[in-house]
Amino acid sequence: MAIERTFSILKPDATARNLTGAINAVIEEAGLRIVAQRRIRMSEAQAKTFYEVHAERPFYGELVSFMTSGPVVVQVLEGENAVAKYREVMGATNPAQAAEGTIRKKFALSVGENSVHGSDSAENAKVEIAQFFDEKDIVG
């Protein structure tokens, strides 16, 4: 199995409830290492660029507003099959459908306020990581 990296965001609904430590514990218990982490306030420009793939979707404006409404924690996670592993650990987008023990089942408030983002592919992880971190910021 290949060691790879994925990108994670702890969203404003999670940071507002001081869940960074609790979510990090779930991530680490799953065997993923947090090799870079930064708490930031995402600008509107950053959010629009990051979620550009959703620009034509009806929820785009609301998503950008939500992601800029408070601090977020951006992270690089590393481990065997990190992208798939983290998606499993996050759980379904809708917390009502998420498996027991997943981040979204434990912490998400709703489909929109679902506490975390994770890359959907290794290729997208590289692009997303590069938007927030230089290679020198990632320490494994």
Curated annotation (Swiss-Prot):
EC nos: 2.7.4.6
Binding site for ATP: 11, 59, 87, 93, 104, 114
Keywords: ATP-binding, Cytoplasm, Kinase, Magnesium, Metal-binding, Nucleotide metabolism, Nucleotide-binding, Phosphoprotein, Transferase
Membrane-traversing stretches: none
InterPro entries assigned: NDK-like_dom, NDK-like_dom_sf, Nucleoside_diP_kinase
Gene Ontology biological process terms, A to Z: CTP biosynthetic process; GTP biosynthetic process; UTP biosynthetic process
GO molecular function, one term: nucleoside diphosphate kinase activity
Entry cofactors: Mg(2+)
UniProt catalytic activity: a 2'-deoxyribonucleoside 5'-diphosphate + ATP = a 2'-deoxyribonucleoside 5'-triphosphate + ADP; a ribonucleoside 5'-diphosphate + ATP = a ribonucleoside 5'-triphosphate + ADP
Coiled-coil regions listed: none
Alphabetized Pfam families for the sequence: NDK
Record-annotated active site: 117
Keyword Nuclease applies: no
Main location per the UniProt record: cytoplasm
Subcellular location, record wording: Cytoplasm
GO cellular component terms, A-Z: cytoplasm
Functional summary from the UniProt entry: Major role in the synthesis of nucleoside triphosphates other than ATP. The ATP gamma phosphate is transferred to the NDP beta phosphate via a ping-pong mechanism, using a phosphorylated active-site intermediate.
Quaternary data: Homotetramer.
Stated family: Belongs to the NDK family.
Designated name of the protein: Nucleoside diphosphate kinase
Biological source species: Methylobacterium nodulans (strain LMG 21967 / CNCM I-2342 / ORS 2060)
